[in-house]
Amino acid sequence: MATAWGLRWGLSRTGTLLLAPPARCARRALHRQVDGTTFQSIYSLDKLYPESKGADTAWKVPEHAKQASSYIPLDRLSISYCRSSGPGGQNVNKVNSKAEVRFHLASADWIEEPVRQKIALTHKNKINKAGELVLTSESSRYQFRNLAECLQKIRDMIAEASQVPKEPSKEDARLQRLRIEKMNRERLRQKRLNSALKTSRRMTMD
């Protein structure tokens, strides 16, 4: 039995490995090596937000933006979960995977006042009667992915509202003026045609 075992594993009398062990044995050895480590998914919060500390999720504002704050304080947000709508397979009506994030926009001092005002004008359909900005996500069957998408929506809103519109060049201003003049000429021409058509109809009826 020992001889057969030695031949099977390709071992010499001194214990030197002559042949590579089977693949399943290599996998077992690999599993034994990683038993002491902690596995983290690529979608874990530590990897999605590597600069996050405690309840604050760090976010770098673009250089061209005026927004001074560089983080989204999670403790200032109201986060809740509910059941998603639509088809969900085995999870339908069983798992609270839909994420909802809301916060009072007017009192969100971690966003500059001009940025808050622009967000209130641009996304007024997302603000309820209590003045809360409500964002939802149910694109994934996992809570943390939907939560990450809601936070990304907040970042996109802040970045969009923080951008300073650039001044048009002289050439762009000239082209814009020519387009407006052309539109006005076409509008007056159509107006004259309609007036002439109505006049001809009255003359025909008389």
UniProtKB/Swiss-Prot annotation:
Taxonomy of the source species: Eukaryota, Metazoa, Chordata, Craniata, Vertebrata
Modifications after synthesis and translation: Methylation of glutamine in the GGQ triplet by HEMK1.
Catalysed reactions, semicolon-separated: an N-acyl-L-alpha-aminoacyl-tRNA + H2O = an N-acyl-L-amino acid + a tRNA + H(+)
N5-methylglutamine modifications at: Q90
Enzyme Commission identifier(s): 3.1.1.29
Function summary: Essential peptidyl-tRNA hydrolase component of the mitochondrial large ribosomal subunit. Acts as a codon-independent translation release factor that has lost all stop codon specificity and directs the termination of translation in mitochondrion, possibly in case of abortive elongation. May be involved in the hydrolysis of peptidyl-tRNAs that have been prematurely terminated and thus in the recycling of stalled mitochondrial ribosomes.
Listed InterPro entries: Mito_Release_Factor_mL62, Pep_chain_release_fac_I
The organism's place on the tree of life at top rank: Eukaryota
Name this protein carries in UniProt: Large ribosomal subunit protein mL62
GO molecular function ontology, one term from the record: translation release factor activity, codon nonspecific
Subunit structure: Component of the mitochondrial ribosome large subunit (39S) which comprises a 16S rRNA and about 50 distinct proteins.
Enzyme class: hydrolase
Transit peptide, residues from-to: 1-29
Entry keywords, A to Z: Hydrolase, Methylation, Mitochondrion, Protein biosynthesis, Ribonucleoprotein, Ribosomal protein, Transit peptide
Alphabetical list of PANTHER family matching this protein: LARGE RIBOSOMAL SUBUNIT PROTEIN ML62, PEPTIDE CHAIN RELEASE FACTOR
Assigned protein family: Belongs to the prokaryotic/mitochondrial release factor family. Mitochondrion-specific ribosomal protein mL62 subfamily.
Subcellular location: Mitochondrion
Cellular component, GO annotation: mitochondrial inner membrane; mitochondrial large ribosomal subunit; mitochondrion; nucleoplasm; plasma membrane
GO aspect biological process, one term: rescue of stalled ribosome
Keyword Hydrolase: yes
